[in-house]
Each structure stands twice: as C-alpha cells, then as structure tokens.
C-alpha cells in the first residue's frame, strides 16, 4: 500500500517565503501611510522645485524668502491658537476678522489717538500700551466666543460666524472703509509706529522670532502642563 502525501498549499510548505511577502506588504503600507501623512510637505517641496526651475535663482533669493517668512509668521501665529481650538473639536471662523478689528483699532490709536470730547483733549499712547490693549481686546472677544459656546450651547460654527461679522462691521465703521497707512507715531512718546515689529533682526523678520517663541510655548503647554493634557484629552 502506497500512502499519498498530504497536499499542502505552497505557502504552507514555505513559511519563510510567506513571512517575507507579508513583511513587504507591511512595509509598503507603512510607506504609503507616511507619504499620505506628509503629502502637504511633499506638495510644498514640489512647488518650490517647480518655481525654482521656472524662475531660476530669483525665486530662492534672500528678498523672496524674507517676504515669504514675514507672511508665514503671521499665519503661523494664528494657526497656533487655532490648533488648541481644533484639538478640542471646535472651530473659530472669527479669527481673521478679530485680527482685522484689533489692527484697525491699533492703527487708529497710534495715528489719531483717542479724543475725549467732553474734556477737549486727545490722548496718544505708546506702542507697548497699544499692543497690550489690543491683546486684551482679542482675549475679551475670544472669551465671549467661549461663553457663547459653553454656556449658551451655541455651535462653535454659528457663534464664531456671528462674531466674525460683528468684528468686521466694527472695523468698517471705525475706518469708514479706508486704511491706516504711513503710521509714524510721535517721537516724544517713544511712539514711532510698529517699525520694530515690521523690521528684520539679523536678516530675519521679527515676526518669525515671535512665531518661534510662541510655538515653543505652545508645545510646552500641550506636552508639559495639566492644561495641555486636558486639551489633548
């Protein structure tokens, strides 16, 4: 009597080959996930390469990079604040309008001052005082948004949409549709405008330094402090 050997699938008879194939599939999946996570950065690199080829060395010139860094720093600072909101599952549509409002108020304070009609005097303020005042105004608007969402139960989208239009309306009323340009201030008050904030330090825009400091502070808050743990939770 001849016994026929059991027929096994080829993969069962070659476990080493099966493991190799599984490892390759796993590596391919990990590579694909990595590419998907970094797709924004990849697109950015491709755009830089494309415009470098099209425009030559002028695209990566010092003046161009400085201009880009100045604008990116502004949006980066806004993004840091939005990060905390988005992590908690919220959204804030009013952030751009709030920036426009406080910018308009700051321009008015530094160029025109605040006129007290009942006393017949006009008060002018130094740049540090104006900056602190605008930060307080921004915090108050943010607190109002938070109270509307948490205490009144209004959806963040609706609450911040309303705040966006209110801030935009106040900015238009304050400026009558005009802009504040050539903001020089008054030397006697040490108030020469926002030249320092708009200037460069060691060839790098001041806003980039501010953004870097705020980014480090944000990371420390999220990773090291109980408030950050609560936000991430």
Q: What is the meaning of each model-derived region?
A:
Residues 48-52, 61-112, 140, 147-154:
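Single transmembrane alpha-helix segments in multi-pass membrane proteins
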Residues 1-20:
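Short, Lys/Arg-enriched N-terminal segments with co-localized hydrophobic residues
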Residues 114-163:
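Alpha-helical transmembrane segments within multi-pass membrane transporters and channels
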Residues 38-45, 68, 75-76, 97-101, ...:
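Hydrophobic alpha-helical transmembrane segments
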Residues 227-233:
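Short cytoplasmic-facing helical segments at TM-TM junctions of multi-pass membrane proteins
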Residues 156-225:
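Transmembrane helix-bundle core of multi-pass membrane transporters
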Residues 17-79, 114-129:
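Membrane-interfacial amphipathic/re-entrant helices at transmembrane-helix boundaries
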Residues 40-53, 82-83, 135-138, 167-169, ...:
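Hydrophobic core segments of alpha-helical transmembrane domains in multi-pass membrane transport
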């Amino acid at each position: 009597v001849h016994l026929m050997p059991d027929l096994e699938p080829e993969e069962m008879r070659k476990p080493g080959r099966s493991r190799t194939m599984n490892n390759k599939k796993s590596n391919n999946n990990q590579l694909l996930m990595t590419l998907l996570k970094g797709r924004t950065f990849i697109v950015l690199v491709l755009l830089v390469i494309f415009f470098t080829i099209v425009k030559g060395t002028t695209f990566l010139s010092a003046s161009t990079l400085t201009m880009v860094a100045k604008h990116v720093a502004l949006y980066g600072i806004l993004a840091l604040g939005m990060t905390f909101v988005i992590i908690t599952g919220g959204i804030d549509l009013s952030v751009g309008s709030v920036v426009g409002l406080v910018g308009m108020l700051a321009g008015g304070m530094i160029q025109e001052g605040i006129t007290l009609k009942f006393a017949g005097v006009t008060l002018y303020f130094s740049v540090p005082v104006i900056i602190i005042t605008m930060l307080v105004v921004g915090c108050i608007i943010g607190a109002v948004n938070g109270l509307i969402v948490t205490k009144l139960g209004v959806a963040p989208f609706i609450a911040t949409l309303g705040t966006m239009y209110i801030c935009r309306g106040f900015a238009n009323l304050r400026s009558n549709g005009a802009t504040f340009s050539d903001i020089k201030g008054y030397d006697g008050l040490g108030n020469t405008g926002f030249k320092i904030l708009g200037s460069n330090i060691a060839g790098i825009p001041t806003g980039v330094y501010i953004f870097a400091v705020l980014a480090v502070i944000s990371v420390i808050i999220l990773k090291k402090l109980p408030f950050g743990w609560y936000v991430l939770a």
